[in-house]
Amino acid sequence: MSQPCKDSDAKLRAACDRCHELKIRCTRTGGTESRCDRCEKNDIDCVYRAHRRIGRPKSQKSRCGPNTTARQNDTTTRGRIQQEQQEQMDISPPENRDSINSDFDFSIFEASGAVEWHRSSDVINVSTHQVSSTHPPFISPDCSLSHESSMSQTGSGSPFSMLNIGTMPVCDLDLSTLHGYGPSTDLVRSINHRSGSENESMEGNAELQSTQSASGSPQEEDQMLEDRLLRHQAKLRCLYSTVDATRNLISTTNDTVSHGAPLDKVLEAIMELVEILQTNANHTSSSSSSNSTTVDGPSEIRNQSRSRQDIANFNDIAILHVSISYAYIVKILAPIILSLEKSSVPVGSTSSSTYNDTTAHPSSASLPSQTGGPTKPRTVSVSLGSFSLASKPALNAQILLGMISRMLDQLHDATQPILMQVRHHHVPTQPVALQEREHHDAAMTREQHVSTGHGPDRHTSPVLSSAQAAVDSIRNEEKELLAKLNKVGNSTSATW
């Protein structure tokens, strides 16, 4: 039976509670005292409530009994829960997107500017890193596993915060995707704009890898060393692409804008490579001393497993990465030192030449400005707090050249054993461009790398041939670079 309100003065709704909640028409063919057709069919209670007043409620109690009020509250709560469940069912789940677990944002390839980075020579050889495909992914200068904004704060967390210049994005390649090349279910890390996070992530990765290498097997240590060197090589390639892109633009537009890479990033790259080499040398000396105290069988097996490694515990692939990285550094420093040399004139000269630091994004750093002209040069000046040498270009250039000279000497001492070993192999190779040598090395299969990296015929290894070609390609530039730095150092010491 229908359960209307007992008070005859109360005006009831035209629909029962259930029909009102479901927003359907409520009909009673059995009369006013019977249940509605729907409640009669479903054999449920049919309650007709009074109209709710709009505004402030009356002070007197509800004219309906307490049982009716409790039933109304239960019905309202149950209807609200059903409505929320229906809304949740209507919301479709988001589609899963395949992504690469890397610091590279591969969507940037489609948004590249006027400069085409999809060249076959832009392939870095990672076939020996257990890549399932013979065509590893391209290494683009528009790279981001820690992609910093080009206008981030200067020198945050950097040992070169004294240089009053900006920063640029740096590749942070996740080697886990190269070991198992293919789609992953993890999302790519979004581009962040927190200054200093790039340096912190680099230091954290270096500490983690050094900690793991202390307790890993020889194969794991070799793999982690190759990973660190490949990361460093990718970062240097980003810096070199800035120089190369600007040089190509100048040759096509006949502009006279100086080209160069951010000096603070170049100095950081030199320090990082020196740190990698010194860390590996210290670990090698400690492990060799511990192995010499052991005369059991496992030590002999371990020594046999390390028989293919070269000086400082470097194998062929590590030697190749070091050679290419050193060649990149020489090529990047060449235009910087040339521009600074013009600025380091004797005191009293009116020359005001400056090194133009293109600190913008690699794909747009060398492009013309929005007004149609070339990009405006930025002066690199040494600053310590409020003290700055921006008004003293000659002294500023001499100090910068002194910093570069000292750091390049450290790098030369750290890489000299490896480079000397590469040069003494006497592999007959023709001098080719550095990027063409990378493309040739990337076209090799894993079987070729492995088969040529062992045994007494190692001097014919194509990997060492590539390393020697990279070193030979910058032989003249290296001599000129060191001669200029020595000349500047002698003139600076005589002036001071």
UniProtKB/Swiss-Prot annotation:
User: Where exactly are the transmembrane stretches of this chain?
Assistant: none
The UniProt annotation puts the region (Disordered) at 57-102, 189-224, 281-307, 348-379, 444-470
**Example of a GO MF term:** zinc ion binding
Q: Where would you say this protein principally sits, based on its record? A: nucleus
What SUPFAM superfamilies does its record include? Zn2/Cys6 DNA-binding domain (SSF57701)
Q: Where is the composition biased (Basic and acidic residues)?
A: 444-460
Q: Which UniProt keywords apply?
A: DNA-binding, Metal-binding, Nucleus, Transcription, Transcription regulation, Zinc
InterPro entries, per database record = Zn2-C6_fun-type_DNA-bd_sf, Zn2Cys6_DnaBD
Location relative to the cell: Nucleus
Pfam families under this entry? Zn_clus
Q: Which residue stretches does the UniProt record annotate as biased composition, category Polar residues?
A: 65-89, 207-218, 355-379
An annotated GO cellular component of this protein is:
nucleus
User: Which CDD domains has this protein been placed in?
Assistant: GAL4
Q: Where are stretches of biased composition, namely Low complexity?
A: 281-294
Q: Which residues bind DNA?
A: 16-46
Q: Which domain of life is it from?
A: Eukaryota
Purpose? Transcription regulator that specifically up-regulates the gene cluster that mediates the biosynthesis of fusarielins F, G and H, decaketide compounds with 5 methylations and a decaline core that act as mycoestrogens as they stimulate growth of MCF-7 breast cancer cells. Probably binds the 5'-CGGNNNCCG-3' motif present in the promoter of all the cluster genes.
Q: What is this protein called?
A: Fusarielin biosynthesis cluster transcription factor FSL7
Query: Source species, please?
Result: Gibberella zeae (strain ATCC MYA-4620 / CBS 123657 / FGSC 9075 / NRRL 31084 / PH-1)
